[in-house]
A protein has these predicted regions:
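Conserved C-terminal RecA-like helicase domain
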Residues: 101-250
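A compositional/structural signature marking long, glycine- and acidic/polar-rich segments
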Residues: 1-2, 349
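Generic recognition of flexible, low-complexity loop/linker segments
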Residues: 1, 22-26, 72-73, 120-128, ...
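Non-catalytic, well-ordered alpha-helical scaffold segments
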Residues: 111, 115, 148, 276-279, ...
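Catalytic cores of large soluble enzymes that bind and process phosphate-bearing ligands
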Residues: 7, 15-19, 65, 102-109, ...
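Signature of the SF2 helicase/ATPase Hel1-core->accessory helical subdomain module
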Residues: 2-100, 110-111, 255-316, 320
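Catalytic cores and motor modules of nucleic-acid processing enzymes
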Residues: 122-130, 135, 142, 146-188, ...
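Generic, well-ordered alpha-helical scaffold segments in large soluble proteins
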Residues: 10, 14-18, 26, 30-34, ...
Length: 608
């Protein structure tokens, strides 16, 4: 009461929902003199007001006064604070009445939706990133009953009991896909609350089995909290594929205020929502995450015409009247741009084999054109209607793209090395040196990902400390599986990790609290030291010089070849060799052997 008669400043975050008009009026009556400041990304305008309730205010302006400052979606995208949206509108076309709900409740329709989610979202869900680094999706429906029906249908699909089969391309990356869950308020529908609770307990049982938890219906808040953390993946524990989800089915939960940067896509199988609800739902997908997540993905499955109108209106409303920045081009526009960029690329280099013979100026033009082509190719791949077999019709193959990509990377290196060409030429495009290929599929196992998994075994976070012995063994088996996959590309680093894992299995506390990354890097350095020492003993060369060569070896070039030859001791070499080679052959053979050692023994330990 001591504040009631004073001037009070009240600041409200998420003011579109945090304080209702009725509650605000009650607070104002208590605090006789108050100044209110509201922050919101989705204010209520005259176009989307609060429901009429007597004489209560219906817009954010009526509640808080004139807007003091605007920071729109366009501003945030321009500042690289969030991503733009790629929106696809699916569903029955050319229907007179798109609002006929009977079109969307059949199992046939639902299987078509699941076909898109399970088999047509390879790039939307980040399968090109590889196991453990894929993204997540939300599927939102208009009712709890439909959400439950989708959950049951997904279980049937996974058990092979429907006509819908998961593509081998998907299963090669994630054999256990999809890992899914469901969440809704068990009191949302009082009439069906008993059924909802029973169905939710069945879902909890599935969740418990999947992740080793023990949630009952009475612990629904604990379950929701755990689900939120699992989706957000901000704790080290959830970096492991064993602890991840691919899809969560919701009605309204998680559509506002939930922050999960690794969530890339929202699949909407419900009628068009209002502008405020659309933007809130869309905004779950456009958080900055990694270099391959370049926009938030939205896929709708009902009333395509009405949905497009609704989305365009909502984005205009919250982007100061424009959709240009926030919404990416549709399939037709992207496909046209892709064809044009491919044509331009072919003019620059009809085949990848032409690139090495180009001048630096020509290489710069090629690099810029390939960056444009790669950008449109990545956008094309992200649409659900994209099929790999379409490439033949465009006049290029995935293998040819990979060859172009290889030449592109080599050309970038040559441009960097060209010290004579640093002066800008007005006739040559500026090369974006920081550009990273977007359409390139690289499903190799990531070195740092395995390091993080091992780190969580030896130094678990708080949530991971109570796991059972069975779960610990499951974690270790997962790490071993990844190491074996790494062995295909880098057997030397894989062998070091295998040694480390063996030591951890013998004594899990041996490296507790220590940095696994530092330990592995030290083990790699020890291997490099041994290889260098053995080479120097054999050829009587300077260890410092050979070590320098090992640390700076690039593209087959030994940077200090002359110095190594100068300090090499042929006399000592000859004394210990029973059948020593002539001096004129010694230097040539020694450098050839060094290059082979660097390529086969050192380089794999320097690369991950």
């Amino acid at each position: 009461t001591e504040y009631a008669d004073k001037w009070d400043c009240i600041i409200v975050d998420e003011c579109h929902r945090a304080v209702t008009p009725g509650i605000k009026r009650e607070i104002e009556r208590f605090f006789g003199n108050s100044l209110w400041y509201g922050f919101t990304g989705t204010p209520r305008f005259a176009e989307n007001p609060y429901p009429q309730m007597g004489d209560l205010p219906r817009t954010t302006q009526e509640l808080y006064g004139d807007c003091l400052h605007k920071y729109t979606i366009q501003n945030a995208i321009h500042d690289n604070a969030v991503l733009g949206f790629q929106v696809e509108h699916n569903g029955p076309k050319n229907k007179k009445d798109e609002t006929d709900s009977n079109l969307y409740v059949t199992e046939s329709h639902m299987l078509k939706v699941l076909e898109v989610i399970l088999n047509k979202s390879y790039y939307k869900l980040g399968f090109q990133n590889g196991k453990g680094k894929t993204y997540e999706g939300l599927l939102t429906t208009s009712s709890i009953q439909l959400a439950q029906k989708y959950y049951d249908l997904l279980k049937m699909v996974k058990e092979g009991k429907t006509t819908l089969k998961i593509d081998e391309k998907i299963k090669q990356v994630l054999p256990d896909f999809p890992k899914f869950a469901i969440t809704y308020s068990v009191t949302e529908n009082e009439e069906g609350s008993h059924v909802n609770q029973q169905k939710m307990q069945e879902s909890l049982d599935d969740y418990n089995k999947m992740f080793g938890t023990k949630y009952e219906i009475s612990q629904i808040q604990g379950y929701n909290g755990n689900l939120n953390k699992r989706l957000a993946r901000k704790d080290a524990k959830y970096k492991s594929r064993n602890e991840q989800l691919d899809l969560v089915i919701v009605v309204d939960r998680l559509l506002t205020g939930f922050d999960a940067p690794c969530l890339s896509t929202i699949f909407i199988d419900r009628p068009p929502m209002g502008p405020h609800d659309l933007i809130q739902a869309f905004s779950r997908t456009n958080r900055i995450y990694d270099k391959n997540k370049v926009y938030g993905q939205i896929v709708t499955f009902q009333a395509p015409k009405l949905f497009k109108e609704g989305v365009d209106n909502a984005v205009r409303l919250y982007s100061a009247g424009s959709t240009q920045t926030a919404l990416l081009a549709d399939w037709k526009e992207v496909e046209s741009a892709f064809r044009k960029s491919l044509k331009a690329l072919r003019v620059s280099a009809e085949t990848p084999e032409e690139v090495p013979g180009m001048s630096i100026k020509e290489k710069k033009i090629f690099v810029k054109l390939f960056q444009d082509f790669d950008k449109f190719f990545a956008q094309l791949k992200s649409f659900t209607q994209y099929e790999d077999n379409m490439l033949a019709g465009y006049g290029i193959t995935e293998d040819e793209y990979t060859d172009y990509a290889g030449q592109y990377l080599n050309a970038k290196e040559k441009i960097k090395e060209d010290t004579d060409g640093q002066i800008d030429d007005p006739g040559v495009p500026v090369v974006d040196e920081d550009y990273e290929l977007m359409a390139y599929s690289h499903t190799k196992i990531d070195y740092e990902y395995i390091i993080n998994l091992i780190q969580n075994i030896v130094s678990p976070d708080e949530e991971s400390q109570d796991v059972t012995q069975e779960q610990k063994q499951k974690q270790m088996d997962e790490v071993k599986q990844y190491v074996e996959e790494l062995r295909k590309d880098n057997p030397k680093v894989a062998e070091i990790m295998t040694t480390l894992i063996g030591e951890i299995e013998q004594d899990v506390n041996k490296y507790k609290g220590q940095s696994i990354l530092n330990i592995v890097e030290n083990m790699k350095q020890e291997c490099i030291e041994k290889v260098v020492t053995d080479f120097c003993i054999t050829w009587y060369t300077s260890k410092d010089d050979v070590m320098y060569a090992a640390m700076h070896y690039r593209n087959g070039e030994i940077p200090n070849e002359s110095a190594i030859k100068e300090t090499a001791n042929f006399t000592s070499y000859k004394e210990v060799q029973e059948r020593a080679i002539p001096k004129f052959k010694y230097y040539t053979m020694m450098i050839a052997e060094l290059r082979k050692t660097l390529d086969e023994e050192i380089k794999p330990l320097m690369n991950h």
